[in-house]
Amino acid sequence: MDIFREIASSMKGENVFISPASISSVLTILYYGANGSTAEQLSKYVEKEENMDKVSAQNISFKSINKVYGRYSAVFKDSFLRKIGDKFQTVDFTDCRTIDAINKCVDIFTEGKINPLLDEQLSPDTCLLAISAVYFKAKWLTPFEKEFTSDYPFYVSPTEMVDVSMMSMYGKAFNHASVKESFGNFSIIELPYVGDTSMMVILPDKIDGLESIEQNLTDTNFKKWCNSLEATFIDVHIPKFKVTGSYNLVDTLVKSGLTEVFGSTGDYSNMCNLDVSVDAMIHKTYIDVNEEYTEAAAATSVLVADCASTVTNEFCADHPFIYVIRHVDGKILFVGRYCSPTTNC
């Protein structure tokens, strides 16, 4: 969650959407070629492939792909190549067709949601390009009925509101909790997809209460909040929305502790025969949330309620909120902030 916190704090008032799964995959590739303190810093982001396979095997459309493109004239070390296996391909970075081919690969894989990944021709000094793309599409276990979708005010701030298409369902059973913390009170609800993934939505009690929650959104806290959920009959209202994102993650990752990974400080002596540096890390994302399903992409996812009461509560996301798409084992696939209905739509 630390990467999301850094991006959110630097983009106040803007929608944010990232895929920790995709980011970790690229950092894992760098780890395989790193040495010394660079490898030590990257080690906490190492992604185990079986974790991704576990998600892919469920009854959802989830795909992940990692590709490593190396300069054809460079000599890459056998130990590095063994670790990345068939993900590696040599290319001519000075050929404009190389960029077109890479963009086409990502475009097809994400079903047209990320295009282009690379906007500019690469520098002739480029030695290696590592990309990771993930695609997720899943139907809600309990779909929203379109007849209940209507225009509804969304409060961007206590004094500003805009109309959104608000999806609604009534009297259904979902895992829900009202959480009270020293930094603020909020509600959290789990909206399951068919299969073993779900969307967690974190909604502050106060219209302007999201920032303090973001600042305290750690993996430990998030797990604690999820463990507090209880099955509840509840009316749910969340906006339909589409969000796209484009980020150069270098500054964010440096602030997150990767101080010896980028630029001249990085040690990638286990990668190839050249003195290489990582100068950019581009992360592009897309999400579409509607009545039937959630579709998400990134390049760099039957509750039986045992309720003692039939009193119906309400969860109305009519002001800024955080949403997390995760697997049942706790793996976070995507995390985002929705706060600006007039942008990224």
UniProtKB/Swiss-Prot annotation:
Keyword tRNA-binding attributed: no
Cellular compartments annotated: Host cytoplasm
PROSITE patterns, per database record: SERPIN
Keyword list, A-Z: Host cytoplasm, Host-virus interaction, Inhibition of host caspases by virus, Modulation of host cell apoptosis by virus, Protease inhibitor, Serine protease inhibitor
Site description Reactive bond, residues in chain: 306-307
GO terms for biological process, alphabetical: symbiont-mediated suppression of host apoptosis
The keyword Chloroplast is annotated on this UniProt entry: no
Domain of life: Viruses
Gene Ontology molecular functions: serine-type endopeptidase inhibitor activity
One GO location term (cellular component): host cell cytoplasm
Main localization, broad class: host cell
Function recorded in the entry: Viral serpin that inhibits both cysteine and serine proteinases involved in the regulation of host inflammatory and apoptosis processes. Major anti-apoptotic protein which inhibits both intrinsic and extrinsic pathways and strongly cleaves host CASP1 and CASP8 but is a rather poor inhibitor of host CASP3. Prevents the proteolytic activity of host interleukin-1-beta converting enzyme (ICE) and ICE-like enzymes. Can also block apoptosis through host tumor necrosis factor (TNF) receptor.
Recorded family membership: Belongs to the serpin family. Poxviruses subfamily.
Name of this protein: Serine proteinase inhibitor 2
Species in which this protein is naturally found: Rabbitpox virus (strain Utrecht)
Gene it is expressed from: OPG199
